[in-house]
């Protein structure tokens, strides 16, 4: 048998190797060390020395070193043995011996080296609790031979790493594994090559797949009844994950599940080494932050995917994070071992959930828990990587909560009171009137339980902030040292958010990925630092790539799983993993269980279209109706269009949930499953014509959910990395929808831009087809004279529900593709500014001023503004809409050409509401009701102020509200609007430097006698704009804040929401588009339609659309030379006639923004007070199409094609 040593707190990070032993039942220690000694001995336990600050006495000296008592290292409690000689090595490499004559002996870990080569094995980790009656650690004998650099399987959390030719059964259901044995499934056979490890689940073997000659890892579960149920859960979770892209979301890829001699066998990809073995190989040295960051980013991505699926990993630790290929892909990791995973709705609190060192406080205290426990574990993991030693290495749960409490403070009283296991570790103080909890002393806990408290920490911190002072690198200087200190500050900030004791306040995976430590925005202040450059280079591994051999492997090896583990010795069933096999070939993207369903077939290697089932919508084996209807054929583009700067691209697809559930109507709270996948590198040659078939018939369900495919353009070179934020629109009829970010965030530095947008309401169309041909197109010249009546041209298309003209949209597709204007893809070349919906009231007399103050950090103005405020086809012909005479329009824009960035104002007159006699005046409003309403945004060019109220324009604008003349601004850039129903939008200037983005809006609303709310009802507005400096909203007076969410910060990437309720089903015109084209101040030629006499293009025309279009904006790609300015991207979700909106912004180095309004039916975004029957499913009957980059006007209807040689989408 092997002798046992117990490690309690080695004080340094740089020396000895430890060996590992298999634990069978009893675990009285926190860390144990066992060597293959010829003299087999058992060592019993004795009391541990208390932690003091004094020096150890002479009997505690090792190699002439005096050690503080809290640095106790190796405890040898062996009263039956008088002398134990341990060979130690000093710093110079010479050996020295020291005789331990006390059972309470300490040794300095940095000077201890177990020199025998066969003792270099892994340190034991704990997953079970301490047996209070056990005083002996049972150790299993293992042959001495160890391979230090051997491979470790990625399929299991191996707790022992001894390599043997065969393994014997432990008597608890382990399979008798023999080398070169053949394991057979129904489709494949595997030859056992090597035994890799053993755990509580069973064992792992390295095997050779005979059909494909691949090396795989097979996890052989025990056939013990206690493992049967959990094995079934693991198989079901792996089956669910098999439909996801394992490379994108960084979890181990599972190939097959089968039964072999009543043992469940799981086949996984072979991975190299787990993080714990990696640390051990490097002598538990601390890992630099530049290496911790990519690991954190990849694991957080995996956790976000699990969270979106409603899954909890529940056993995240360094052993379960595997390095894929340390040589070829440094710090590329994947998450393994879903043996403890469960669904959130089925989570049951268990004493043994999570490994103890990484166990969340809610598990220890017996509180309800969710997927937030994985974020706690991840925080402990990155702390261990940073320190080289576990942050909280508790030998028992009491020690664990004691360590946490000593460093982070006691849990809140309401948590302790609600915990079912609180009384095990805490006592109420009877001396205080208020019932406060007090942590039991180690003596009290030992007296009650018989479990001795131990000190196993290497570092004892009074607070987590003290971690920033340890292990500071000495080889950094100058800007490198400043960058390292800044990096540590952000790391500690993120760590504290991950280790928040209250799970409800703990940071989520999505916010983790948007934290500055991950996005590295704080490092942009040190552009010339080599340290910073290496940090960015290390994050390159986070760029998700799909390799050809991965695709081939998946084609040859479909996932299979068993149905009933105990019914047959070899029973297999196919998973559905066809989704990962379509990267470079024309294949049908359909689940094997839904083979008859409609498919998305992709032949072009530029884009990957993937479909998967949401956690809320399980897969259905029933065929989807309508699959035989017409399809949409998208042809690949030309050589010029396919050539892009970065060969790696990410693609979003938002698939309708009903499409995956057999188009069954549902009233459940639903969401869009979001799928992201990579494409293979682009070749400059023009590919062969391979159509993309999209069956439009599958989108004929009742709820009009849009099918959207889009790829965001990344930053170039050393510019800040961007993260695209996919989202889920959770909605149900009769309830206001919430924008919920549930899908994965694009990892850093995705390249290339591709866009495909497919409209939602296909059932409205008699026949929809995209062909590679040129259809008759309604065209308008790029330049129009000032006297030409734009409204007359527009009115030709403003009547009728369907339009016969065909709109050519090469700006969305690579070749000439035509779309019927009955289902257009609305595109706008603009920097989006969404006006406040103050016109949603049917009466313009009870409108009130809604001041909005916004400070932007962007101060470079485009030279031209293309403005279209058209409501003609997007408005409903009703009693609330009337044609405004052209001659009544005011001059909307006066922007002087000044050197400093002025305020750009677009004023839209709205005089279309009917008068009503009964008015409702809220008493909370401090402003007098006026006959005209002014909604505006003031943009300040100063990026340094923290308060948007410090804008130099705020005083003028607030004073303008109190007047009755309707003046919007006083001073430079003044715009006077002397009328009623005025809506003003200030277009923020652009600036490429970083800074704070503060959006503050104030709006006060009045309700008519029909109780139709205005733009913002007090108390119903909330907003969020996540930027590197956070979101700040100032609420002025008694008005409710309504963020306009105009964020131009380069690093902001989120899906902010602002929710308001409205009962007005009639839509209003809510769009204004401004396209920044260069870095010069705004100038308008008086010959342009913006200054045409009477401004005919501002005249609204009646339309036949009761639903407001929703805007999705994405940046168009441009070459590096064409990047004149950095534009901002906004996602504006404008519900039907309501003022509720949500916006997300991501900055891209592109000068073109495409905006696509998509109509959304009541099942997606409905108002709480409007019945679903009041909504009709109609798609936008007209579209906004951006003209070419050099165009002098902005037009909102079918135009001539843009210069497709500049922009590519496929």
From Swiss-Prot:
Polar residues: compositionally biased ranges: 921-940
Region (Disordered): 835-856, 909-974, 1046-1069, 1084-1103
Active site positions: 315 (proton acceptor)
Family matches, as Pfam families: Pkinase
Binding site for ATP: 196-204, 219
Region spans: Interaction with TP53: 885-1093
Matches recorded under CDD domains: STKc_HIPK1 (cd14228)
Annotated tissue distribution: Ubiquitously expressed with highest levels in skeletal muscle and heart. Overexpressed in breast cancer cell lines. Isoform 2 is highly expressed in testis. Expressed in both androgen-dependent and androgen-independent prostate cancer cells.
Residues joined by cross-link Glycyl lysine isopeptide (Lys-Gly) (interchain with G-Cter in SUMO2): 25, 120, 124, 991
Disulfide cross-links: none
Membrane-crossing segments per the record: none
Motif (Nuclear localization signal 1 (NLS1)): 844-847
Region (Required for localization to nuclear speckles): 891-998
InterPro entries per record: Kinase-like_dom_sf (IPR011009), Prot_kinase_dom (IPR000719), Protein_kinase_ATP_BS (IPR017441), Ser/Thr_kinase_AS (IPR008271), Ser_Thr_dual-spec_kinase (IPR050494)
One MF annotation (Gene Ontology) recorded for this entry: protein serine/threonine kinase activity
PTM description: Autophosphorylated. Phosphorylated and activated by JNK1.
Chemical reaction(s) catalysed: L-seryl-[protein] + ATP = O-phospho-L-seryl-[protein] + ADP + H(+); L-threonyl-[protein] + ATP = O-phospho-L-threonyl-[protein] + ADP + H(+)
GO cellular component entries: centrosome; ciliary basal body; cytoplasm; cytosol; nuclear speck; nucleoplasm; nucleus; PML body
Main location per the UniProt record: nucleus
Superkingdom: Eukaryota
Biological role: Serine/threonine-protein kinase involved in transcription regulation and TNF-mediated cellular apoptosis. Plays a role as a corepressor for homeodomain transcription factors. Phosphorylates DAXX and MYB. Phosphorylates DAXX in response to stress, and mediates its translocation from the nucleus to the cytoplasm. Inactivates MYB transcription factor activity by phosphorylation. Prevents MAP3K5-JNK activation in the absence of TNF. TNF triggers its translocation to the cytoplasm in response to stress stimuli, thus activating nuclear MAP3K5-JNK by derepression and promoting apoptosis.
Family statement: Belongs to the protein kinase superfamily. CMGC Ser/Thr protein kinase family. HIPK subfamily.
Subunit structure: Interacts with Nkx1-2, Nkx2-5, MYB, PARK7, DAXX and p53/TP53. Part of a cytoplasmic complex made of HIPK1, DAB2IP and MAP3K5 in response to TNF. This complex formation promotes MAP3K5-JNK activation and subsequent apoptosis.
Identification of the protein by name: Homeodomain-interacting protein kinase 1
């Amino acid at each position: 048998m092997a002798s046992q040593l117990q490690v309690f707190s080695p004080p340094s990070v740089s020396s000895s190797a430890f060996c590992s032993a298999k634990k069978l039942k009893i675990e009285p220690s926190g860390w144990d060390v066992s060597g293959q000694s010829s003299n087999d001995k058992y060592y019993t336990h004795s009391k541990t020395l208390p932690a003091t600050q004094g020096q150890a006495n002479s009997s505690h000296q090792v190699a002439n070193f005096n050690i503080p008592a809290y640095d106790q290292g190796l405890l040898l409690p062996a009263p039956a043995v008088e002398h134990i000689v341990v060979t130690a090595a000093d710093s110079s490499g010479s050996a020295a011996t020291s005789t331990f004559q006390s059972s309470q002996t300490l040794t300095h870990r940095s000077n201890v080296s177990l020199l025998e080569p066969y003792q270099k094995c892994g340190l034991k980790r704990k997953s079970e609790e301490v047996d209070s009656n056990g005083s002996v650690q049972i150790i299993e004998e293992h042959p001495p031979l160890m391979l230090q650099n051997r491979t470790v399987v990625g399929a299991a959390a191996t707790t022992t790493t001894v390599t043997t030719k065969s393994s014997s059964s432990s008597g608890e259901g382990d399979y008798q594994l023999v080398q070169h044995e053949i394991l057979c499934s129904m489709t494949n056979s595997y030859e056992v090559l090597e035994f890799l490890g053993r755990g509580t689940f069973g064992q792992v073997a390295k095997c050779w797949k005979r059909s494909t000659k691949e090396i795989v890892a097979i996890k052989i579960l025990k056939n013990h009844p206690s493992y049967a149920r959990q094995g079934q859960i693991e198989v079901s979770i792996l089956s669910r994950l098999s439909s996801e892209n394992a490379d994108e979301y960084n979890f181990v890829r599972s190939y097959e599940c089968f039964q072999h001699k009543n043992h469940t066998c799981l086949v996984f990809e072979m991975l190299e080494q787990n993080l714990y073995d990696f640390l051990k190989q490097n002598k538990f040295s601390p890992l630099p932050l530049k290496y911790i960051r990519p690991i954190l980013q990849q694991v957080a991505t995996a956790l976000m995917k699990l969270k979106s699926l409603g899954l909890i990993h529940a056993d995240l630790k360094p052993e379960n994070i595997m390095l894929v290929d340390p040589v070829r892909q440094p710090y590329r990791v994947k998450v393994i071992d879903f043996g403890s995973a469960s669904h959130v709705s089925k989570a049951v609190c268990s004493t043994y959930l999570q490994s103890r060192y990484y166990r969340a406080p809610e598990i220890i205290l017996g509180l309800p828990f969710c997927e937030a426990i994985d974020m706690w574990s991840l925080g402990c993991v990155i702390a261990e990587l940073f320190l080289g030693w576990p942050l909280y290495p508790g030998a028992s749960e009491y020690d664990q909560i004691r360590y946490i409490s000593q460093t982070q403070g006691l849990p809140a009283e309401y948590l302790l009171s609600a915990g079912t296991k609180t009384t095990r570790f805490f006592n109420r103080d009877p001396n205080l009137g208020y019932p406060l909890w007090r942590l039991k002393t180690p003596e009290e806990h030992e007296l009650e339980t018989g479990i001795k408290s131990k000190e196993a920490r290497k570092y004892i911190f009074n607070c987590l902030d003290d971690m920033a002072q340890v292990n500071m690198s000495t080889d950094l200087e100058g800007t490198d040292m400043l960058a390292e200190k800044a990096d540590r500050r952000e790391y500690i900030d993120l760590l504290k958010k991950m280790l928040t004791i209250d799970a409800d306040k703990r940071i989520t995976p999505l916010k983790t990925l948007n934290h500055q430590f991950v996005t590295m925005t704080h490092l942009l202040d040190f552009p010339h630092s080599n340290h910073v450059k290496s940090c960015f280079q290390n994050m390159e591994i986070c760029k998700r790539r799909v390799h050809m051999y991965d695709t081939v492997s998946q084609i040859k090896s479909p996932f299979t799983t068993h149905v009933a583990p105990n019914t047959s010795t070899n029973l297999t069933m196919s998973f559905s993993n066809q989704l990962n096999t379509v990267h470079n070939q024309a294949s049908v993207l359909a689940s094997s269980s839904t083979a008859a369903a409609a498919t998305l077939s992709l032949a072009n290697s530029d884009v990957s279209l993937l479909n998967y089932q949401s956690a809320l919508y399980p897969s259905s084996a029933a065929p989807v109706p309508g699959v035989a209807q017409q399809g949409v054929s998208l042809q690949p583009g030309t050589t010029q269009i396919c050539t892009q700067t970065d060969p790696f691209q990410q693609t979003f697809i938002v698939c309708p949930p009903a499409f995956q559930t057999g188009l069954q109507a549902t009233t459940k709270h639903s969401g869009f499953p979001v799928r992201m996948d990579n494409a293979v590198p682009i070749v400059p040659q023009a590919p062969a014509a391979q159509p993309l078939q999209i069956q439009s018939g599958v989108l004929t369900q009742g709820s009009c959910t849009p099918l959207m495919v889009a790829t965001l353009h990344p930053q170039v070179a050393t510019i800040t990395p961007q993260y695209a934020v996919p989202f889920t629109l959770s909605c149900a009829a009769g309830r206001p929808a919430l924008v919920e970010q549930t899908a994965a965030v694009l990892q850093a530095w995705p390249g290339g831009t591709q866009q495909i947008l497919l409209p939602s309401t296909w059932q409205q169309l008699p026949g929809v087809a995209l062909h590679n041909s040129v259809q008759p197109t309604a065209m308008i010249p790029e330049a129009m004279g000032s006297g030409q009546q734009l409204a007359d041209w527009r009115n030709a298309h403003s009547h009728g529900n369907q339009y016969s003209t065909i709109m050519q949209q090469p700006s969305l597709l690579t070749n000439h593709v035509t779309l019927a204007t009955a289902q257009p893809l609305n595109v706008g070349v603009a920097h989006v500014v969404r006006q406040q919906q103050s016109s949603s009231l049917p009466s313009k007399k009870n409108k009130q001023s809604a001041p909005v103050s916004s400070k932007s950090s962007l101060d470079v103005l485009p030279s031209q503004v293309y403005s279209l405020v058209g409501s003609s086809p997007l408005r409903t012909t009703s009693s609330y809409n009337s044609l405004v005479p052209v001659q009544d329009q005011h001059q909307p824009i006066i922007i002087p050409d000044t050197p400093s960035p002025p305020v750009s104002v677009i004023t839209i007159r709205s005089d279309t509401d009917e008068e009503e006699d009964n008015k409702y005046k809220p008493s909370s409003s401090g402003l007098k009701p006026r006959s005209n309403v002014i909604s505006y945004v003031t943009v300040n060019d100063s990026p340094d102020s923290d308060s948007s109220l410090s804008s130099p324009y705020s005083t003028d604008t607030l004073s303008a509200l109190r007047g009755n003349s309707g003046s919007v601004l006083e001073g430079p850039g003044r715009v006077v609007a002397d009328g009623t129903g005025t809506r003003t939008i200030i277009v923020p200037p652009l600036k490429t430097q970083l800074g704070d983005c503060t959006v503050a809006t104030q709006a006060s609303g009045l309700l008519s006698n029909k109780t139709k709310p205005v733009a913002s009802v007090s108390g119903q507005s909330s907003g969020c704009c996540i930027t590197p400096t956070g979101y700040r909203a100032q609420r002025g007076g008694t008005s409710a804040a309504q963020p306009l969410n105009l964020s131009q910060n380069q690093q902001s990437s989120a899906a902010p929401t602002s929710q308001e309720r409205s009962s007005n089903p009639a839509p209003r015109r809510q769009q204004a588009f401004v396209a920044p084209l260069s870095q010069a101040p705004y100038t308008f030629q008086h010959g342009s339609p913006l200054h045409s006499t009477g401004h005919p293009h501002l005249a609204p025309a009646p339309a036949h659309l009761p639903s407001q279009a929703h805007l999705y904006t994405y940046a168009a790609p441009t070459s590096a030379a064409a990047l004149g300015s950095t534009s901002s991207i906004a996602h504006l979700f404008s519900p039907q006639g309501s003022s509720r909106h949500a916006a997300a912004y991501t900055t891209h180095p592109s000068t073109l923004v495409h905006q696509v309004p998509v109509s959304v039916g009541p099942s997606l975004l409905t108002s709480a007070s409007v019945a679903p029957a009041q909504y009709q499913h109609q798609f936008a009957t007209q579209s906004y199409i951006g003209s070419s980059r050099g165009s002098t006007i902005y037009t909102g209807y079918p135009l001539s094609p843009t210069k497709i040689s500049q922009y590519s989408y496929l």
